[in-house]
């Protein structure tokens, strides 16, 4: 069995970066994709020889098709890239705003997964983790219904993938709650709403990364599941 090689989208910062760091500490190789070149290069440099980085926009099917997945063939995938969108009632959203959310949060993971399946190394048991959200289960906070809808679609996609790709691949989703990352800045909740979280605080990217590591490398009989990392909040 070869060393695991994990493709991570949205890997330049936040949860994606924390997952990459955790996996490198386990001895895995990581393929880092993001649209932010400077941050991506910095993350790659910090992770060292077990990391390769490439600027890839998962909303662009041609960019995905052109990405290098042959130098290091991936065995595992983390569909982490996503956007929150602007706080606005779904009644006021333009079609273009809704389509952009769905393009990045739903279509992107589907396209990346298809490319991963065509490229993946077959000599190592593999797994996929999709980064959803508790918003996909509860509909999202006021003003973020479109985000919640996109993450709900990703949860449905996770279950379909788990069914269709078994027994060769395990597929699970993570559903974080309020996590201290740049994307969550200005999002509903945060430290000011800590009283709404049973554990009394927001989570960290590292705590989500720990759950991702477990699903990827240490959960051989777990598939088709949604693991909440939300401090008890639903």
Across the structure, where does each feature detected by a protein language model lie?
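Substrate-binding pocket helix/loop in short-chain dehydrogenase/reductase
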Residues: 88-90, 94-99, 193
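Active-site loop-to-helix junction immediately N-terminal to the catalytic Tyr of the SDR YXXXK motif
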Residues: 93, 139-148, 160
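Active-site helix of classical SDR
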Residues: 113, 150, 158
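Alpha-helical segment proximal to the catalytic Tyr-Lys
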Residues: 118, 159-167
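Short, small/polar-rich loop/turn modules that mediate ligand/substrate recognition or access, typified
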Residues: 125, 166-170, 222-224
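Residue(s) in the substrate-gating loop at a strand-loop-helix junction
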Residues: 133
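C-terminal substrate-recognition "lid" of short-chain dehydrogenase/reductases
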Residues: 204-229
């Amino acid at each position: 069995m070869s060393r695991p090689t994990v493709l991570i989208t949205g890997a330049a910062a936040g949860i994606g970066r924390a997952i990459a760091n955790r996996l490198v500490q386990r001895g895995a190789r990581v393929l880092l994709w993001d649209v932010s070149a400077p941050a991506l290069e910095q993350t790659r440099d910090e992770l060292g020889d077990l990391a390769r980085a490439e600027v890839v926009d998962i909303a662009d099917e041609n960019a995905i098709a052109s990405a290098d997945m042959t130098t290091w063939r991936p065995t595992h995938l983390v569909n982490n890239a996503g956007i929150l969108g602007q706080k606005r009632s779904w009644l006021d959203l333009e079609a273009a705003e809704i389509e952009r959310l769905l393009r990045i949060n739903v279509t992107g993971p589907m396209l990346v997964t298809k490319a991963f399946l065509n490229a993946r190394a077959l000599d190592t048991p593999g797994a996929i983790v999709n980064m959803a959200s508790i918003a996909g289960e509860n509909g999202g906070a006021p003003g973020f219904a479109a985000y919640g809808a996109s993450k709900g679609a990703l949860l449905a996609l996770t279950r379909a993938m788990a069914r269709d790709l078994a027994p060769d691949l395990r597929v699970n989703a993570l559903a974080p709650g309020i996590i201290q990352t740049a994307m969550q800045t200005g999002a509903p909740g945060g430290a000011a709403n800590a009283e709404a979280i049973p554990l009394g605080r927001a989570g960290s990217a590292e705590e989500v990364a720990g759950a991702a590591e477990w699903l990827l490398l240490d959960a051989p009989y777990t598939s088709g599941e949604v693991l909440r990392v939300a401090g008890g909040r639903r």
